[in-house]
Amino acid sequence: MASCCPTSRGAAASNKSYTFKGKEIENFGGLTTYVVGSTSNTRVLIGFMDIFGLSDQIKEGADKLADDGFTVYLPDFLEGKPLPVTALPPKTPEDQKLCNDFFSTRISPNLHWPKLAKVVEAVRANHGPNVTIGTYGFCWGAKVLVTYPATIDFVGIASCHPSFPDSADAANVHCPVLFLCSKDEDAKIIKEWEEAFKTNPAYAKSSFETFSDMFHGWMAARADLSNPEQRKRFDEGYQKVSSFFQSLM
């Protein structure tokens, strides 16, 4: 669990004053999905949640990316059963058991690859043969993306405060990557990942950056958007994701 969430922070309160620009649809590739943007768009991003599910923070982030010209899909890969925000960090034996069960049975990447493949199929069916697809993931979601067997389907993968980093995964990735790390990820392992990727032609269009003043989860459910500094860095993170995909599409 420490590798998944290398911080003692729990999820933050959502931004109650914000009005979402997208909508949730019941069945997109078999999953309830938050979508923002036009179905006629050929520039599509698929976001992969963290363990806290379809949080308000990642929906707001999707809206920011849509403002820059992308259509964004946030599928509920945890199918309505994320880890409760009150359970992490665990405060009771019941919380600890809930966390142990969740991490041991719910987050193996291979459980989620077939779901992602169906979402990719749905994107192609909705947006046509000329669509280009990028993906971005938070924490555990980033691990699912870089280990996905068909990364060649994507023009790029953005990994935001990635969990379970392993340099062996670099050999599986066949597109440019953006790593946006916090102070909580293991810098040595991230550097090993980058070094392993340097022989890949996609490295030339890749970037590895660290927000040394931010914590694991600052672009997702742990972001307190009422805090001016966290809001600033949240916005900067999404701008970097946007610029990365703008350069590839």
UniProtKB/Swiss-Prot annotation:
Disulfide bonds: none annotated. Keywords: Cytoplasm, Nucleus. It comes from the Eukaryota. One of its GO terms (molecular function) is hydrolase activity. Gene3D superfamilies: alpha/beta hydrolase. Its main location: cytoplasm. GO terms for cellular component: cytosol; nucleus. InterPro entries: AB_hydrolase_fold, Dienelactn_hydro. Pfam families: DLH (PF01738). Coiled coil: none annotated. It is found in: Cytoplasm; Nucleus. Belongs to the AIM2 family. PANTHER family: DIENELACTONE HYDROLASE DOMAIN-CONTAINING PROTEIN-RELATED, DIENELACTONE HYDROLASE FAMILY PROTEIN (AFU_ORTHOLOGUE AFUA_6G01940). This is Uncharacterized AIM2 family protein C30D10.14. It comes from Schizosaccharomyces pombe (strain 972 / ATCC 24843) (Fission yeast). The lineage of its organism: Eukaryota, Fungi, Dikarya, Ascomycota, Taphrinomycotina.
